[in-house]
Amino acid sequence: RLLWRTLIGHSWPAEGIRRLLAIPRSIHELIWGLLLLQVIGLQPVIAVIAIAIPYGALVARVVSDLLDSLNERNLQALVAAGTAPPAALLSAMGPPLLPGLISYGGYRLECALRSATLLGVFGLGGLGNELLLTLQSLQFHELWSGLWLLLAVMLSLEAVVGALRRRWGMPGRFSLRAAGVGRRGRELVLAGLLLLPLVFGVGRALAIEPAALLHWQALPPIAPGGWQEALALPWPSLVFNTVLLTLLAAALAVGVAPLLLLLVAPWPWGQRLLQLIWAIGRLWPPPLTALLLLFVLKPGVITAALALGFHNLGILGRLLLEGSEAAGAQRQEALRCSGTGPRLALLYGRFSGLARSYLAYGAYRADVILRETVVVGLVAGTGLGTQLNQSLSAFAFDQLLLLLVAYAALTLLGEDLSDRARQRLLQQ
């Protein structure tokens, strides 16, 4: 909204684009991969496009929300002084936007790593294909070797992103000399230029051919009477169970992260242990966690909610830790020096200032959990995800189309509710 209001004086194009991008956002990358598989065939480019479509829409929404949450006074001052709107936007909003953009970009890159593993079965190869083969052959020792390798890659990625965030997003507290003007900008441009040949080289090594997107295959015809069968599905029950699964998983993920940090506050090693557990939660995709839970639990909404909640708990826990580190320890140390216990000092010294932004991000995370109900549909035994998997297996494209429309409608409704909740939290 801020971008369009500054450039043309109206924000209505932002609302239209936001609603339009809700359609690709509402469909999980796994479903995009299966749909593209029917249209294009088995090609490595399928996995790349299947990840890029929903992730591009998600990044657009998050960047828009970050821009709208920033203070506009510097921008208004530059525009009032006669600066061109594009230059004013870049100068006033670029520096405060950079830390959040780096943090979210690293998180989204980590998500893409997991999605590439999940979509490796579409011809991309790599760990995804190897993990699928080990599961099919019941070679679980090889499965764990692959997962530990993926964990090492993910932790290395976190370390690199953390170093970049500290270098580009935070001031140097002990630096005796101020950084040169435009240093961060020059380093960002240089990093982008260095990444371009790397991206092309990796794409060439994986035999990714964009020309394959031009050769489409015809979808099978819809059987007579298919629409009547699709409309006869138990839609109220499917929607209710999907919403219930989303709410349970979101409550588990949002509520447990700060409670665990408060619980281990007196012990320095406790936070390290939590970081390891949360890293495993981010590493394991929800379907794998759900399969492990089936050894001790029955298929149902609770099992699927635990799988989704554990995965998203790892994500929210990491972001809460990053926010705590960025907030500084001055208030917490002042409370400790006055005799306050470690848990209360952490609660009032750090978490109180992060509560609104954390809950606002939790509202956004609930939208993502709604998308992820697709991948645990078989474990839930009910809901739109289960029915969508059954329709895909039966090639019932009439049912599939209606189910995707239902997911898009739920996503639009969820985004509207989460936007209202987030704006109310951030404005208080």
Stretch-by-stretch model annotation:
Residues 42-108, 115, 159, 299-350, ...:
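Membrane-cytosol interface at the C-terminal ends of specific transmembrane alpha-helices
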Residues 1-12, 157-269, 273-275, 419, ...:
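N-terminal, non-cleaved signal-anchor transmembrane helix
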